[in-house]
């Protein structure tokens, strides 16, 4: 103890004669991370947190991006339960998957997106890797572009786009640009603006497209509009990067929802594609997705696959196994696949029905506004056209929670609360 006391005294004396030593000691005592600032809260998670604190029995959370049944409860698809039971009965091991994921899952995902009779699938001029849901697919795709797309660093996003698109591409080293997409005056697709902007994008740039059920607007191009977009993309030699998070969940028909992707490929446009099974199989927490690159030939596909594996290895080595087994079991079992397609249609139909009921109830309330855009839009989300101050009133006066831009998750609307929602919207818009 005496020696320790002497050391402290000597240290104090040294500090008195050498101020630099005192500063160094102070620096050592402070945290390495004192300079780290508090980051902004996630806007959607913030909505959910505020909702949870609300004690109003009529409160509604229309911010969450997950399907709910007509009782407002999370829904596990019966086909998923059956697939899990089949997997459990096999007593399979939990060994690592290959870097690219479960092979049969990757093949089935490509066939689901491109069509079982697709020339691309038959010729093998594609590569599909399993990813950590749609977000992981986007990040792998963005990193692949950053490393190998030598023509441009610019990625053109529709305005608006899913909020996570920007940080995903930005953090991968790409630069973000935008093109017109949503028309706030009509609450619909700004086809003229989009086509004009896309036609001016520098050649050999990356164009991000939502394959169906555009998030956050719910506004999709019609097939004839997709055809014109594809013509411009081909003429301008743009690289089409498709995000397809809602196949089957938009219209209830998986082939219809994948129409744009397949049309582009038929026109000789070699796209890349991100898929997610969060929404259409309800596998939110399993993180099941896929990333596909369409190539010139099978040889090129093998080279691309090798580089995708090199990208994946230092990120997460290999993807999780359970969710991929569930999806693969459903997609490759004729009976389960048929059941799943019916369940997906049931979810899509419920959302479409809620859109119709909301408009009907708004009319019953006596609203004189046009709400046709609610039924014209498609998928889980709806851009209501509500202004920020109206959204604020909905929250304060009616305990109805949504993002400030007026986007609602129609999956959070039920036959039990649609009347209340219509009444509240009418009160803040009349």
From Swiss-Prot:
Residues with the Phosphotyrosine modification: 96
UniProt record similarity statement: Belongs to the class-I pyridoxal-phosphate-dependent aminotransferase family.
Keywords recorded for this protein, A-Z: Acetylation, Aminotransferase, Cell membrane, Lipid transport, Membrane, Methylation, Mitochondrion, Nitration, Phosphoprotein, Pyridoxal phosphate, Transferase, Transit peptide, Transport
Phosphothreonine found at: 48
General remark: In eukaryotes there are cytoplasmic, mitochondrial and chloroplastic isozymes.
Post-translational modification N6-succinyllysine, affected residues: 73, 90, 122, 159, 185, 227, 296, 309, 338, 363, 396, 404
Keyword Cell membrane: yes
UniProt-listed InterPro entries: Aminotransferase_I/II_large, Asp_trans, NHTrfase_class1_PyrdxlP-BS, PyrdxlP-dep_Trfase, PyrdxlP-dep_Trfase_major, PyrdxlP-dep_Trfase_small
Protein name (database record): Aspartate aminotransferase, mitochondrial
Subunit record text: Homodimer.
PROSITE patterns named in the record: AA_TRANSFER_CLASS_1
Subcellular location(s) of the protein: Mitochondrion matrix; Cell membrane
Protein residues bound to substrate: 65, 162, 215, 407
EC supergroup of this enzyme: transferase
PANTHER family per the UniProt record, alphabetical: ASPARTATE AMINOTRANSFERASE, ASPARTATE AMINOTRANSFERASE, MITOCHONDRIAL
Function (record text): Catalyzes the irreversible transamination of the L-tryptophan metabolite L-kynurenine to form kynurenic acid (KA). As a member of the malate-aspartate shuttle, it has a key role in the intracellular NAD(H) redox balance. Is important for metabolite exchange between mitochondria and cytosol, and for amino acid metabolism. Facilitates cellular uptake of long-chain free fatty acids.
Residue numbers of Phosphoserine PTMs: 143
GO terms, molecular function: kynurenine-oxoglutarate transaminase activity; L-aspartate:2-oxoglutarate aminotransferase activity; pyridoxal phosphate binding
Cofactor(s) of this protein: pyridoxal 5'-phosphate
Any one Pfam family match given in the protein's UniProt record, by short name: Aminotran_1_2
Organism: Oryctolagus cuniculus (Rabbit)
Sites bearing N6-(pyridoxal phosphate)lysine, chain numbering: 279
GO cellular component terms given for this protein: mitochondrial matrix; mitochondrion; plasma membrane
Modified residue annotations for 3'-nitrotyrosine: 96
Keyword Cytoplasm among UniProt keywords: no
